């Protein structure tokens, strides 16, 4: 595979290989056959980051080969959304001959939505000034005049310049309901929007008929919490990053959801609060003991859950676990399977044409 040519004709074979590999990994836990969710074969990534290469008078996007670290020129990127592909040549054309915008520019980040909004971040190895703001505004306005709904951000050491805003609002159809999600630049969002819809709808399906409340650790912008709220009496969710908490609060209001409570604290702190080990001022007015959380949702980083968190989640009758690394999921299941059984298993092809697998399991207490 090259950045400008996807092996679309090999997609089915690669997905079959992933399915077989996941089944083999999950066999020791008596898991059912995985439900497999296909990705679009192109234009599936809603965000992308590129280095900029200055080659004499020329300027172009590059990425680095993961094995050789050699640079690869990228003029189009079919893995990315059509909007990113439309913006890439327009950004180069607008910057190449503009000394103010080009000087010491080393990276461009694109974040887009299915609703055709974009945030473009320009990263520099120099201080940014009013001249930069003026030229960036001129380029942004030219793109808007051509129909692009785009926002610009300039970044340098300890500097972030927003020309107007640093977010865009995504709209996802989830099981018959349109969900609005504010996505903030430089904060985590699911990269494959089509796969995100599949994950949300699968999570809704496996939690149908749930009793009690839902607890989610590290909820980000509320991606899963808000979609799942319709299946539970109440949802209690924790998140540590301020921009994500702010986005989650906006999303609660935008979606007219009244049964989700976001708490800004780490999972370890939350465990201490639930167990009465410590009191936290930020929990004033929130009666944790009134929550009857029978289901816990976790979507940990590639490293999986640490042993303390594994012990904590074992206390819940139902565990919904989304994993971006089946290897660490299996390590966690070595412990979790002692108390819980795997009821449902799903494979989400979040990253086509790579070895990466995203999967989901629903665990129920034995």
Swiss-Prot record:
Active site per the UniProt annotation: 324, 358
Key words of the record: Methyltransferase, S-adenosyl-L-methionine, Transferase, tRNA processing
Pfam families per the UniProt record, alphabetical: tRNA_U5-meth_tr
Listed GO CC annotations: cytosol
Entry binding sites for S-adenosyl-L-methionine: 190, 218, 223, 239, 299
Gene3D superfamilies per the UniProt record, alphabetical: 2.40.50.1070, Vaccinia Virus protein VP39 (3.40.50.150)
GO molecular function, one term: rRNA binding
Reaction equation(s) it catalyzes: uridine(54) in tRNA + S-adenosyl-L-methionine = 5-methyluridine(54) in tRNA + S-adenosyl-L-homocysteine + H(+); uridine(341) in tmRNA + S-adenosyl-L-methionine = 5-methyluridine(341) in tmRNA + S-adenosyl-L-homocysteine + H(+)
Enzyme class: transferase
GO biological process: tRNA methylation
tRNA processing recorded as keyword: yes
Annotated EC: 2.1.1.-, 2.1.1.35
Function: Dual-specificity methyltransferase that catalyzes the formation of 5-methyluridine at position 54 (m5U54) in all tRNAs, and that of position 341 (m5U341) in tmRNA (transfer-mRNA).
Family to which the UniProt record says this protein belongs: Belongs to the class I-like SAM-binding methyltransferase superfamily. RNA M5U methyltransferase family. TrmA subfamily.
PANTHER family (alphabetical): TRNA/TMRNA (URACIL-C(5))-METHYLTRANSFERASE, TRNA_TMRNA (URACIL-C(5))-METHYLTRANSFERASE
NCBIfam families xrefs: trmA_only (TIGR02143)
Protein name: tRNA/tmRNA (uracil-C(5))-methyltransferase
Annotated source species: Cronobacter sakazakii (strain ATCC BAA-894) (Enterobacter sakazakii)
């Amino acid at each position: 595979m090259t950045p400008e040519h996807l092996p679309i004709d090999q997609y089915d074979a690669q997905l079959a290989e992933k399915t077989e590999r996941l089944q083999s990994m999950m066999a020791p836990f008596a898991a059912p056959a995985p439900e497999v969710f296909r990705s679009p074969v192109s234009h599936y990534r809603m965000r992308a980051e590129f280095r900029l290469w200055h080659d004499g008078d020329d300027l172009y996007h590059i990425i680095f080969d993961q094995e050789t670290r050699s640079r690869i020129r990228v003029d189009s990127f079919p893995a990315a959304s059509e909007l990113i592909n439309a913006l890439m040549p327009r950004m180069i054309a607008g910057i190449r001959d503009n000394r103010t915008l080009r000087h010491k520019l080393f990276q461009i980040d694109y974040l887009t939505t299915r609703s055709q909004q974009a945030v473009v971040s320009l990263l520099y190895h120099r201080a940014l000034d009013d001249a930069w703001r003026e030229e960036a505004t001129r380029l942004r306005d030219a793109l808007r005049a051509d129909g692009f709904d785009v926002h610009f951000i300039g970044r340098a050491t300890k500097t972030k310049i927003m020309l107007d805003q640093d977010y865009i609002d995504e709209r996802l159809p989830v099981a018959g309901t349109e969900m609005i999600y504010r996505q903030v630049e430089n904060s985590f969002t699911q990269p494959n929007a089509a796969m995100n819809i599949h994950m949300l709808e699968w999570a809704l399906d496996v939690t149908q008929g749930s009793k009690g409340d839902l607890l989610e650790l590290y909820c980000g912008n509320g991606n899963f919490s808000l979609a799942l709220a319709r299946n539970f009496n109440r949802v209690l969710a924790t998140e540590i990053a301020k921009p994500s908490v702010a986005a989650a609060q906006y999303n609660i209001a935008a979606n007219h959801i009244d049964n989700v409570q976001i708490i800004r604290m780490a999972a370890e702190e939350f465990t201490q609060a639930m167990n009465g080990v410590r009191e936290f001022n930020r929990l004033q007015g929130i009666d944790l003991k009134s929550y009857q959380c029978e289901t816990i949702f976790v979507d940990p980083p590639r490293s999986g859950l640490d042993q303390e968190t594994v012990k904590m989640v074992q206390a819940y009758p139902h565990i919904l676990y989304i994993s971006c690394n089946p290897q660490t999921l299996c390590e966690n299941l070595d412990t979790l399977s002692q108390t819980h059984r795997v009821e449902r298993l799903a494979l989400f092809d979040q990253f086509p044409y790579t070895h990466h697998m995203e999967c989901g399991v629903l665990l129920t207490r034995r």
